[in-house]
Amino acid sequence: MFSRAVRLSRAALPIRVASQRVPIAARRSVTTNAAQAQVDKSTIPESEDEPFTIRLSDESFETYELDPPPYTLEVTKKQLKQMYYDMVVVRQMEMAADRLYKEKKIRGFCHLSVGQEAVAVGVEHAIEKTDDVITSYRCHGFAYMRGGTVRSIIGELLGRREGIAYGKGGSMHMFTKGFYGGNGIVGAQVPVGAGLAFAQKYTGGKKATVILYGDGASNQGQVFEAFNMAKLWNLPALFGCENNKYGMGTSAARSSALTDYYKRGQYIPGLKVNGMDVLAVKAAVQYGKQWTVEGNGPLVLEYVTYRYGGHSMSDPGTTYRTREEIQRMRSTNDPIAGLKQRIINWGVATEEEVKGIDKAARAHVNEEVAAAEAMAPPEPTAKILFEDIYVKGTEPRYIRGRTLDEVYYFN
């Protein structure tokens, strides 16, 4: 029922852009409440696949030099359940990674996204597999949503050859078709994403690139360079700042002169989104994709979200913020709890049915993690270092190593 392989296409329905710009005075501050969308329950069909219309909160968006997206969204029961399942899987996978790291089975850098699941899931449910996604080192959820398996992602974290990057990339460097990482250098993925968007425009078609980075990376010069080139060439690029309030241990207000990251493009329109509401994210990205593939050029989105854990596994996450702040966000703004509440209240599923989805997601993750843990460690041979570098048939005759006698010959 919840197979990633058989999920139906999520092409956006036509959205008409309003002709009148909304005065600044009419705009509201974006909330992080995950359960404010409403629906007329009498319009919800019996069929799992028949669409119905929900009304998003008036505090879902803020805009800059842009007409706001529609505050309505067409969904089906099946889509709502799938989004819920996906978020539970991503969270359980991240919690498994947390456990394995503390057991010293995962080493090195490891950045988890517990609390931020609505962004990865909402983005994927708004685009097509022919679109491209590139993000930062906090990438596990995106790797899964782009088509990776829990087994291959955990296997990668464990350094196994069956991992999504053959055990060579680790936490920060995961790749699959249409997903270009997972990038370890702060902000470095942004100009690469602009290049992907350039390729899409060059080859034609209604495709877009979703380019994600954090608030901590937003002050990087290369981000602004990418903005300039994307606007200059009118590229189909959806830049997106995942504003989780802290760049490592530094709050946004202490590091950025302008914390309205959606306005950072200056000459590029911007859209601020409630990143704790998976439905608001889906609606915003659907709107953004249609905007950009119609030839309007790039957009800068800001997803207002929150990470429950530290910046990385080496950060307890409580030296620069209070435990009370974290608990308040968990208890009042959790993206999974918010969607669960709406699914039950709207009669999309009963409480028992939702528990069944929870159970299925947890069982799937547990099975996949166990399979990853059972993978044999790779042989520590130098030969592995020279594999997966060149496309087969394009290799040079040899590669020299650190010393004159350390030479690897391709067969």
From Swiss-Prot:
Q: Which reaction does it catalyse?
A: N(6)-[(R)-lipoyl]-L-lysyl-[protein] + pyruvate + H(+) = N(6)-[(R)-S(8)-acetyldihydrolipoyl]-L-lysyl-[protein] + CO2
Q: Which cofactor does it need?
A: thiamine diphosphate; Mg(2+)
Q: Which residues are recorded as binding Mg(2+)?
A: D215, N244, Y246
Q: Which residues bind pyruvate?
A: H111, Y137, R138, G184, V186, D215, G216, A217, N244, Y246
Q: What is its EC number?
A: 1.2.4.1
**One Pfam family, short name:** E1_dh
* Stored InterPro entries: DH_E1, PDH_E1_Alpha_Subunit, Pyrv_DH_E1_asu_subgrp-y, THDP-binding
Which keywords are on file for this protein?
Magnesium, Metal-binding, Mitochondrion, Oxidoreductase, Pyruvate, Thiamine pyrophosphate, Transit peptide
Q: Which residues bind thiamine diphosphate?
A: Y137, R138, G184, V186, D215, G216, A217, N244, H311
Q: Which GO terms describe its biological process?
A: pyruvate decarboxylation to acetyl-CoA
Instruction: Report the subcellular localization.
Output: Mitochondrion
Give, as one word, the top-level EC class: oxidoreductase
Q: Where is the transit peptide?
A: 1-29
Gene Ontology molecular function: metal ion binding; pyruvate dehydrogenase (acetyl-transferring) activity
Q: Name one GO cellular component term.
A: mitochondrion
Q: What does this protein do?
A: The 10-megadalton pyruvate dehydrogenase complex contains multiple copies of three enzymatic components: pyruvate dehydrogenase (E1), dihydrolipoamide acetyltransferase (E2) and lipoamide dehydrogenase (E3) and catalyzes the overall oxidative decarboxylation of pyruvate to form acetyl-CoA and CO(2). Within the complex, pyruvate and thiamine pyrophosphate (TPP or vitamin B1) are bound by pyruvate dehydrogenase E1 subunits alpha and beta and pyruvate is decarboxylated leading to the 2-carbon hydrohyethyl bound to TPP.
Kindly state the subunit structure of this protein: Eukaryotic pyruvate dehydrogenase (PDH) complexes are organized as a core consisting of the oligomeric dihydrolipoamide acetyl-transferase (E2), around which are arranged multiple copies of pyruvate dehydrogenase (E1), dihydrolipoamide dehydrogenase (E3) and protein X (E3BP) bound by non-covalent bonds. The Chaetomium thermophilum PDH complex contains 60 E2 units, 12 E3BP units, about 20 E1 units, and 12 or more E3 units. The units are organized in 1 E2 60-mer, 4 E3BP trimers, about 20 E1 tetramers, and a maximum of 12 E3 dimers.
Q: What is this protein called?
A: Pyruvate dehydrogenase E1 component subunit alpha, mitochondrial
Native species: Chaetomium thermophilum (strain DSM 1495 / CBS 144.50 / IMI 039719)
